[in-house]
């Protein structure tokens, strides 16, 4: 993921065809080490492809995953958890705000604000 992020930053920054050295420089600038074999494999797979096409392809794959998932049986449990969380919220003591004289830190007169 770090390689793809660095590649995308370079493309969005105006470098239409980032090299392995370009990606390494970006990663090194934020203190991340890179593995040459993984970087070479990524650049080989991305060769000749536009970033916006890759993003569209990835988005369609992600949306197909969420569309195929059916509802889980966790809806009833979520309702029970909400009741428990509500009970916890009621138990918290509320703190009152105190009028505190801040020692006239803004240089005004001695009146209370």
From Swiss-Prot:
Residues 60-113 are annotated as: Disordered. InterPro entries: P1/P2_N_sf, Ribosomal_P1/P2, Ribosomal_P2. GO terms for cellular component: cytosolic large ribosomal subunit. One of its GO terms (molecular function) is structural constituent of ribosome. Residues 88-99 have a biased composition (Acidic residues). The lineage of its organism: Eukaryota, Sar, Alveolata, Ciliophora, Intramacronucleata. P1 and P2 exist as dimers at the large ribosomal subunit. The keyword Phosphoprotein applies. One of its GO terms (biological process) is cytoplasmic translational elongation. It holds the Pfam family Ribosomal_60s. This is Large ribosomal subunit protein P2. It comes from Euplotes raikovi. Belongs to the eukaryotic ribosomal protein P1/P2 family. Phosphorylated. Residues 74-85 have a biased composition (Low complexity).
């Amino acid at each position: 993921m770090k390689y793809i992020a660095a590649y995308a930053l370079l493309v969005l920054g105006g470098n239409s065809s980032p090299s392995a050295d370009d990606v390494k420089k970006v990663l090194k600038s934020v203190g991340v080490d890179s593995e040459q074999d993984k970087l070479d494999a990524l650049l080989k797979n991305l060769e000749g492809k536009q970033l916006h096409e890759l993003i569209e392809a990835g988005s369609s794959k992600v949306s197909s995953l969420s569309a195929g998932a059916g509802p889980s049986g966790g809806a009833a449990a979520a309702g029970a958890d909400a009741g428990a969380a509500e009970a916890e919220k009621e138990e918290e003591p509320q703190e009152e705000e105190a009028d505190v004289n801040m020692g006239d830190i803004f240089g005004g007169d001695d009146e209370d604000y």
